[in-house]
């Protein structure tokens, strides 16, 4: 399954490391990533892939909650199909 993950919050050291480590522990592969900082506000969008017979989106979201709390972030994930449908012009 492919999904889109968004990460936002106050910029500080270690955000990318914390998010990528948590995803690696879940065996979630990062296919593409775009990251920027706007006025001390960190934003990152990741295109990720994982085996949906082993893991589902709800589990990924739940397992990212400790990273959200520890890093002071908002992390959201949705299926690539849903993301594309919502953002289609």
Curated annotation (Swiss-Prot):
Cited Gene3D superfamilies: 3.30.70.260
Domain annotation ACT: ranges: 4-82
UniProt cross-references to InterPro entries, sorted A to Z: ACT-like_dom_sf, ACT_dom, UPF0237/GcvR_regulator, UPF0237_ACT
A Pfam family annotated for this UniProt entry: ACT_6
Classification via CDD domains: ACT_1ZPV
Family under the similarity heading: Belongs to the UPF0237 family.
Protein name: UPF0237 protein Cgl1544/cg1742
Provenance organism: Corynebacterium glutamicum (strain ATCC 13032 / DSM 20300 / JCM 1318 / BCRC 11384 / CCUG 27702 / LMG 3730 / NBRC 12168 / NCIMB 10025 / NRRL B-2784 / 534)
């Amino acid at each position: 399954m492919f999904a889109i993950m968004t990460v936002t919050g106050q910029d500080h050291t270690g955000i990318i490391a914390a998010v990528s480590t948590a995803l690696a522990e879940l065996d979630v592969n990062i296919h593409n990533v775009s990251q920027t900082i706007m006025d001390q506000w960190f934003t990152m969008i990741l295109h990720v892939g994982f085996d949906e017979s082993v893991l589902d989106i709800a589990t990924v979201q739940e397992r990212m909650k400790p990273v959200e709390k520890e890093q002071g972030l908002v992390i959201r994930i949705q299926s690539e199909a849903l993301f594309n449908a919502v953002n289609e012009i």
